[in-house]
Curated annotation (Swiss-Prot):
It is found in: Cell membrane. GO terms for cellular component: plasma membrane. Belongs to the UPF0756 family. It holds the Pfam family DUF441. The lineage of its organism: Bacteria, Bacillati, Bacillota, Clostridia, Eubacteriales. This is UPF0756 membrane protein Dred_1097. The chain crosses the membrane at residues 6-26, 52-72, 75-95, 111-131. It is a multi-pass membrane protein. Its main location: membrane. InterPro entries: UPF0756_TM. It comes from the Bacteria. The keyword Cell inner membrane does not apply.
Amino acid sequence: MQRANIILLSLILMGYLAESALLATAGCILLVMRLSKLNRLMFLLERRGLEVGLIFLMLSVLVPLAHDNIVYKELVMKTLSPQGLLALIGGTLATHMNGEGLKLLKLDPQLIFGMVIGSLIGIVFLGGIPIGPLMAAGLTALFLEVIYWFK
């Protein structure tokens, strides 16, 4: 059995044991694609998969704004409240960190495996929720930058 198949099977097993349906499903899909020799589709996923995933994530977050039952005055009031302003700051910093994480992943895609293992540790031992590699990559980029400052 080839190494890639073993790694994918390991990811499926880790996803199952950590009760992470996302990881297990992604591993299954990649294994089926690999065994079916769908190389073109794998190449497309490698090049554009993150962008497509981000589009779907953005759509899911923006759906409430597309409904007509939102009271816009209330939305503005919530946004300008202390919690809303902190949410604006948090969103701004998080998207900046995610951008730095994306740069890091493009420069060194092998880091994703450590991030997956770290996510599994967070799920199993800290009760975390896996939201994807970008935040983990953003934090990794921040940690690497801090280490660079102290060298």
